[in-house]
Every structure is written in C-alpha cells, then in structure tokens.
Amino acid sequence: MKKIGKALRETAFTLGVCFIAVGAFASSSVYAQTIIEDWDKVTRPAPPELKSVTVDIRSTALLVLDFNGAQDPKKGPCNTEIKPRCLTSVPKVQTMLSEARAKGVFIVYSLAGIGTPADIATAIAPHANDPIVKSGPDKFVGTDLEKILADKGIKTVIVTGTSSEGAVLDTATDAALKGMNVVVPVDGMSSTDLYAEQYVAWHLTHAPGVSAKVTLTKIQMIKF
C-alpha cells in the first residue's frame, strides 16, 4: 500500500507540473502578439541614405521596366488612372536615358500585361535595337534577360520602372542575388501609393544578401 500511495503521489505531482506548464504556455499564447496586432506600434524608420554613384558605361545596363500604358491605360500600369506617379517619373527617367544613350550605355526594356513596345511612354520609347523582355514582376523569370546581360558583359544594372514593389523590387533583388551591382534611383521607381515606395527603399537597403549589392540614389546623383 505504501508503494501504491507513493506512486500515486508521484503521478499527481507529475500531472500537476504538466498542467502548470500547459497553463503557462496557453497564457503566454494569449498575450503573444504578431505584427498584425502590433501594426500600430511600429515606429517609422529613418529614410535610407541616398548615395552618389559613378558607373562604368562598358559594364552597366539601364533597365526601363513596365512603362507601358501611358497612351492607353488598358495597355499597361504607367498611366494616370492606376499609377500617376509613374508618369510623373518619366521626365527624369528621360533625362537619364538620354545621357545613358549618349554615353553608349546598354538599354533594356520590359513590358507588363498586354502592352506592346508602342505602348511605352513616348518620351522614353525604345529604339529599334533595344532588347525588350516581357514577363511578370521578376524580369529574369521566363525571359532571356540574364543571357542578354551576360552576353554584353554587364556587371551593374540601373533599375527604373513601375511598380516599385513589383518589377523594380523583384528584378533588383534577383540581380543582386545573381551577384550584380544594382543601382536604384528612387525618383525612377513608382507605385500606386507612397507606402510601397517607402517599403521598397527600406527593403533594398536592409535585406540580407541584397543590401550589400544595392546603391539607393537619385537620378541626378548617377554619373556615367
């Protein structure tokens, strides 16, 4: 009987410890917060530093991504109905594009959706020999962009376009992870809203494996 009593007491003690542990876990789970619950507690980070950059024209390509839709909103995202900030960025991109062409920089375009080359904003329209790829947000996926750049000995890409959280972020990230140097002018990328542009600027300068290869800048701070 003594052995049975001792065994019962030990069992009861073990069960008690288990109940306490389960209770503590359940209690902590109730109070555990995810980013969704803590959304309003987030402190906005300081803006990333913009840096001047000089690129080697022989090994640099300018990517002009998804600027189609300017003439017909049904033909792409760069229009007054969906992304008016994209149209606002066109004059600055045009300035950089003109200088890049004059210096012999390799230019590559992309298209989104059902757009055709004729749907790209007229001010920055491609020339006859400019390569044009067409795919989803990451312009390396489902295209020969990597080969196009490799065949030209490209080591640095300047990424412009819309949307910032789509074509710019995904293509810039992929390029960085492939070992390329990536230059992103903040006044050459655009989105539907400011938050997306802010997030992309933060992500590109903080993401592990990416930030070390990315230079965030402005168009006027890029020297060819």
What spans do the regions from the language model cover?
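C-terminal segment of classical bacterial N-terminal signal peptides
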Residues: F19-S29
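A short alpha/beta connector and helix-capping loop motif
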Residues: G76-A100, G104-F106
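Short, contiguous, helix-prone interaction/anchoring segments in small proteins
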Residues: R58-E81
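Bacterial N-terminal signal peptides that target proteins for export
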Residues: K2-V17
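Short, glycine-rich nucleotide/cofactor-binding loops
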Residues: N68, T80-S89, T160-E165
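Short beta-strand segments at enzyme active-site cores
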Residues: V64-L65, V105-A112
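Active-site-adjacent betaalpha module
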Residues: Y31-A61, K103, I114-F224
